[in-house]
């Protein structure tokens, strides 16, 4: 009789498979983003992925780690994907290269690689770019229905690498919509316009012509929501973080909107604009930098939702998912310390 050695149960969900599933779940949101904002997002993702693989491979070589085995876990590709779709589609090529290098080399490998980083690498790269180059990082094109000039793949490629389309237009000219007015994202438009207009007048602007929220952005968020639900269905992520994130953000927005509807954005605008769904299902749920206990995940997600609302309303940036996630990452050791489940046979309590 042959006796097998342990382990006697096996989990087929390897890191490589989970990372690949998360990448595939991003596809609905990427399709929507490409349709409404052009091919630039796809180009940014490809540049980020190439940079991430080269950077991670070089660092692993320097650390004398097995290069191919580490690269095949798909974690570098996922970091690159999240950063690539977070940047404006026509941002200069050197920005995505710089941000990806910072995310992989500094925010991930400097801490020891996958499983050791205390902060979400993609969001570290994003915040570094946002603080360093705020103008370029807020230069989003108008959504397709409002575009004054259609930007195809070739023009997107030219603009990313040279700054101009084949007809000589730069990013600032491309931002001008069909009505001759320079466009911004719904959250940015709402936040800026509140200084001089009440909310009901702001919502008459064409950018807010969507069924749920801003034109284009509502479908991008819906796409990432669909992908996030797929991850929940496949049990690739826990439900605690996205649910508590969205409930906290929606709750804060609902209370403020009911108290002063002329001064605050509606819950739907908060939930279906910016990077809300991407953040809730794909960024905040990073298993390395997020809380690891069930109660801790609820607290962690709710904290991010509250921070997103606070920074959007009172901070200097119209969208704030990256800042909120990184700030919440700082609290993870404390949250995990006080939310560890009691071990059977031991009394609860902390010394």
Swiss-Prot record:
It comes from the Bacteria. Pfam families: NQR2_RnfD_RnfE. Its cofactor is FMN. It is found in: Cell inner membrane. GO terms for biological process: electron transport chain; transmembrane transport. InterPro entries: NqrB/RnfD (IPR004338), RnfD_bac (IPR011303). GO terms for cellular component: plasma membrane. Keywords: Cell inner membrane, Cell membrane, Electron transport, Flavoprotein, FMN, Membrane, Phosphoprotein, Translocase, Transmembrane, Transmembrane helix, Transport. Its main location: membrane. The keyword ATP-binding does not apply. It is a multi-pass membrane protein. Its EC number is 7.-.-.-. The keyword Electron transport applies. The modification FMN phosphoryl threonine is found at residue 185. It is an enzyme of class 7 (translocase). Part of a membrane-bound complex that couples electron transfer with translocation of ions across the membrane. This is Ion-translocating oxidoreductase complex subunit D. It comes from Yersinia pestis.
